[in-house]
């Protein structure tokens, strides 16, 4: 909150300080009004009906959540490089609902599976931004509450699928250090999670440093060198304080206008850091490879989240859920003396011609533990999305489905949703 207050104060001070000599006769209030009046409105409306079925104790029924996300934002006109952005988000329950958010007392239903879309209204973003070219290189500084994404979201994400996005009170710097290379540094002071501000774990303080050097070469390879230093300020989260260093390379590698090689290779090492009382030394591996042809992609993938014990394992507390849309593997699992997660998967995606604007994705997962090689089950996911271009380029409808077959972990689960979204 202190970062947010500082950013608003700085923006108000920037208006009179940024006036040119020829503007000296114009009152600061009039200049401020002009900047505010000539801004840009943004809107994101998404109605979704989501259902989640899980077998076994303690669940006695299915969850269903008909929710409407209304996110309205406003960005001021740039004034001597300064601009400001503010966004509020409201989540409404439209129709009969029955689902659980365990850390939100008003919506805690222990006998129902979790769907993390709480009803409520909150300030989701509010920051001051300054942009300036420095010797031909772009320089951007942002101060305040903002959404931050690192690469594919494995370690830091906004969790855009949920109705409330994750955001941070943060200071961020982006600078072009070379022709096709950008350096990013961010200091994260507080995290606001997707379960909402009123949840017992909806917000927490931390001292985190994010560093990322991303570059592109020959339009065939994108490389990212990153570091994430997390130091939590509350005792229950001390065990999540870690230092993660990693490297990531992605394609596609274009062979000709029709064919390409789709690939991703990533490695990261995580160690205990700051207030963490435990010993942590865990690795993360990701490998994807497959052909791309005329807008279609086929990939085989392998992901490993290392784990030796319940305290010595890879943790990703700021990430969005990976490894299946049932979200059962949102965190690294533990089963007795078996820890960590190995996911092998096949995925196919592409455009559904001749329906312009329609895409589909299908993925099959097979799960094992990292230690002891216990089979955790398998999952089949598919998604359909259709941009209704004949009516509006801003309108999309779609569905998402995930079915998990249990083995030695969890119980059978089915999560499905349909949605309609309008973005401006």
Q: What spans do the regions from the language model cover?
A:
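Small/polar (Gly/Ser/Thr/Ala-rich) solvent-exposed segments
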Residues: 144
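Beta-barrel outer-membrane channel/assembly domains of diderm bacteria
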Residues: 21-141, 171, 175-176, 249-268, ...
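Cleavable N-terminal export/targeting peptides
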Residues: 1-31
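Extracytoplasmic loops and strand-loop junctions of Gram-negative outer membrane beta-barrel proteins
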Residues: 24-26, 53-58, 107-112, 153-156, ...
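Outer-membrane pore/translocation modules
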Residues: 96-119, 307-340, 415
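Signature for the C-terminal beta-barrel architecture of outer-membrane proteins
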Residues: 22-25, 135-139, 158-311, 344-346, ...
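Solvent-exposed loop/turn segments at secondary-structure junctions
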Residues: 91-93, 147-150, 192
